[in-house]
């Protein structure tokens, strides 16, 4: 078996010197292929006597194992070296500045909607929604606005030529108050909801658009009075503007769906010529501005909601989401909200991770 030892030594030497995977494969074929010398020796075992097989068999199998192992190790080494060379040639310079990628932003109105929902959820309010195409009963009649009420005029309301199955006129809702009626009819009392959403009125200037966003709140329970309303609004505005020095002023007003009705002013301070919400409006450098309409729910509205006004009382409030966004984040023209200007959105928009939380701050930016 001197020839076996010599062939094995020559093969192992050739494997060690192989410089390419192709050379390794050629050696494998010459040794382990069908016509290879190792294969020939394995075939010769069949013609040997039992004593010869017992003597030579282990040597032949050992040679095959040695060659197989050497081939695998050399192939792996060559592949590793090739990979390292390729990686070295493709090295990325991480110090180079990355190109700016276009990214979207959360619209201020959407962000403020989330802020309001977070605040009122902490106060026990549920979010309710309703159709934007309403009938005049839910939009006007059930809210104590009869057919002769001026709010029904064509110049204030977008009407459709269609009527519903009951012959009621269809329109784009002028406020989210119909959601209050639908919620009372569906859920009954006690009730504590906010109703954010889009509303429509025929008006357009720097502070008004034909479509805008509104949020209204409704609380129905036993023993509700105006003090509950004031506490709710103070708590809400302090959380929203993230200031403890919020001062409210309630002025008598008129809304057909509340009695008594009050308009809510918030005190502000002039800082570098700009209004900053907070502090008393009676201060030398301060003033008052209206932010909310509210009042105790009219008895007729409670009746239209299917409840007994002698048993249940409530308060309601409403404000423009767009106006709140303008006050909090310093935007001047409401029409810019809907222009789709990417530069404006890039400046005033919020990141996807700017999720409002009471613990982290409802107006936080990442």
From Swiss-Prot:
Q: Where in the cell is it found?
A: Cytoplasm
- An example Gene Ontology cellular component term from the record? cytoplasm
Q: Name one Pfam family in it.
A: tRNA-synt_2d
Q: What is its main location?
A: cytoplasm
GO BP annotations of the record are:
phenylalanyl-tRNA aminoacylation
Q: Which UniProt keywords apply?
A: Aminoacyl-tRNA synthetase, ATP-binding, Cytoplasm, Ligase, Magnesium, Metal-binding, Nucleotide-binding, Protein biosynthesis
User: What does it catalyze?
Assistant: tRNA(Phe) + L-phenylalanine + ATP = L-phenylalanyl-tRNA(Phe) + AMP + diphosphate + H(+)
Q: Would I find Cell cycle among this entry's keywords?
A: no
Its top-level enzyme class, in one word, is ligase
Q: Does the keyword ATP-binding apply?
A: yes
Q: Which GO terms describe its molecular function?
A: ATP binding; magnesium ion binding; phenylalanine-tRNA ligase activity; tRNA binding
What does the Swiss-Prot or TrEMBL cofactor note state? Binds 2 magnesium ions per tetramer.
Cofactor(s) the record lists: Mg(2+)
Domain of life of the native organism:
Bacteria
Regarding protein family, the annotation reads: Belongs to the class-II aminoacyl-tRNA synthetase family. Phe-tRNA synthetase alpha subunit type 1 subfamily.
Subunit note: Tetramer of two alpha and two beta subunits.
- Protein's UniProt name: Phenylalanine--tRNA ligase alpha subunit
The scientific name of the source species is Novosphingobium aromaticivorans (strain ATCC 700278 / DSM 12444 / CCUG 56034 / CIP 105152 / NBRC 16084 / F199)
Which gene underlies this protein? pheS
